[in-house]
Design a protein with these regions (language model features):
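Oligomerization/assembly interface segments of phage tail-like spikes and tubes
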Residues: 73-95, 140-155
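Short, conserved charged micro-motifs
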Residues: 95-102, 157-159
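Viral virion structural and adsorption modules
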Residues: 1-9, 153-160
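Hydrophobic beta-strand residues in large extracellular and virion-surface proteins
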Residues: 15, 86-88, 111-113
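Short acidic, glycine/tyrosine-flanked loop/strand segments centered on an H-E-D-like triad
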Residues: 85-90, 116-131
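Short, acidic/charged, Gly/Pro-enriched secondary-structure junctions
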Residues: 98-122
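Mixed-charge, glycine-accented linear interaction segment located at domain edges/termini
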Residues: 123-160
Length: 160
């Protein structure tokens, strides 16, 4: 059985990308009773796209564009695996900066997703399951896209 959910694009205002190596969360990721995590436990974001509520992001250039998140839940004997596909379309950029690509390839990371109502949620990625993909579409209407795929054993965790 697989459940599918698209978050409404207009409700998402930003996404922070956190390198897993920079994160030291105070709770284990696979305990079902964990419904929230304190904001103070969040490290500085490596990269942000969309509106940046976290002004402490290491990479200061924000990417303006459309953000979409697709969530898929696959249920198996071993448990639930949630897959989150985050896509940002970036108009009028000649190419995605090398500093972004080199910093995110071959890395495990977690995501903080910011919503228009002021709430934020953590997507805790499982080790060795994160994928970073970028593409450049050059022409009269140049655009680029960044896609981040994260697998998790949890639904999105509320940040309080």
């Amino acid at each position: 059985m697989s459940n599918y959910q698209d978050f409404i694009t207009k409700d998402i205002v930003g996404v922070d990308v956190l390198k897993a190596s920079d994160c030291h969360f105070p709770v284990p990721f696979n305990v079902p009773a964990i419904r929230s995590i304190p904001l103070s436990a969040m490290p500085t974001a490596y990269y942000n796209f969309g509106v940046n509520p976290n002004k402490n992001a290491n990479y200061s250039d924000e990417v303006d564009g459309d953000i979409a998140i697709k969530s898929t839940n696959k249920q198996s004997v071993q448990g639930n695996i949630f897959t989150y596909d985050v896509t940002a379309t970036i108009p009028s950029v000649s190419s995605i900066p090398d500093s972004i690509e080199s910093g995110l390839y071959h890395q495990d990371f977690h995501l903080i997703i910011y919503f228009a109502d002021g709430t934020s949620k953590l997507c805790y990625g499982l080790p060795n399951t994160t994928i970073f993909t970028s593409s450049d579409n050059l022409g009269s209407n140049s655009s680029n896209s960044i896609k981040i795929t994260v697998q998790s054993m949890n639904k999105l965790i509320d940040i309080i």
